[in-house]
Every structure is written in structure tokens, then in C-alpha cells.
């Protein structure tokens, strides 16, 4: 991914995604190439609220939240592809996940690197290949399908 690298800080991310604490799971975009892919990161802190119950004696980031982090990175790539006319009223919905696999636990102190590659766009559905890594090792991977709607439209 490297012809034109776009780097987004948390301030720009907050203008593009409707998510807020505790569910905003992208801290920074390291690289973004429209029509190709995105590389983003999530710094995983012991202060994450989900660690209180998952699991108190051995905190592990829930796999579903790793997938959510990948979906949020995909949303940022989508919004780079197709700028929403009304960002305040635009939502990004999951419509499917294929081949989700979890290969390594993600623990407090890890830096989760989110790599999402554009696969195709057909009839309002975006498809992506998504891989989350820690220290260069795959933690999770999946194919994600998503759509963009206005907040007042049914998903």
C-alpha cells in the first residue's frame, strides 16, 4: 500500500466514525490508499473496560472486538473511497463475516495492527479481506461485508 500514504490521527477519525468510548477501536491510521487498503492501529491498554470481565485473572481482548476494530478500519477505508454527503448522519453496517479465524490472543500492552484490503463493491455491499496482527503475527483474520446507510434508513 504505498503510492499515496494518508495518515489520520484520532481527531480526523472522530470526524469520520460515529463510534465513541468505549467502542471506538481505532487509534490511528498509519497508511490509507483509496481503492486499495488501510493499515491502522489499536493500542490495547489494561484500562479497556472489557478486561474487567474477560478475564479478570488473564485479560484477553474478545475476538468479536478484534473483528469490530477491523470493521472500523474498513469503514475508514470506505469513507476515503466514497466521502459521505452527510458524515453526521452516515452509518456503516456489518452485513456479513466469512472465514473468521483467531490465531493468537491479544493482551494488555499489545499493539494491534489492522490491515484491511478492498476486494470488491457490488450493489451497495463492500467486501474486504481483513487481518489483525500483533508483533508481525496474525491474531485474527476474516472477510468482511459491509454497507453504508444514512442513520434514519433501516439497515
From Swiss-Prot:
Places the protein is found: Cytoplasm
Any single GO CC term annotated in Swiss-Prot or TrEMBL for this entry: cytoplasm
Short name of any one Pfam family annotated for the protein: FabA
Keyword presence, DNA repair: no
Molecular function per GO: (3R)-hydroxyacyl-[acyl-carrier-protein] dehydratase activity
Gene3D superfamilies in UniProt: Hotdog Thioesterase (3.10.129.10)
GO-annotated biological processes: fatty acid biosynthetic process; lipid A biosynthetic process
Active-site residues, record numbering mapped to chain: 54
EC number: 4.2.1.59
This protein's UniProt keywords: Cytoplasm, Lipid A biosynthesis, Lipid biosynthesis, Lipid metabolism, Lyase
Reactions catalysed, as given in the entry: a (3R)-hydroxyacyl-[ACP] = a (2E)-enoyl-[ACP] + H2O
Entry similarity comment: Belongs to the thioester dehydratase family. FabZ subfamily.
Function text: Involved in unsaturated fatty acids biosynthesis. Catalyzes the dehydration of short chain beta-hydroxyacyl-ACPs and long chain saturated and unsaturated beta-hydroxyacyl-ACPs.
HAMAP family referenced in this protein's UniProt entry, alphabetically: FabZ
Protein name: 3-hydroxyacyl-[acyl-carrier-protein] dehydratase FabZ
Protein species of origin: Burkholderia ambifaria (strain ATCC BAA-244 / DSM 16087 / CCUG 44356 / LMG 19182 / AMMD)
Gene this protein is translated from: fabZ
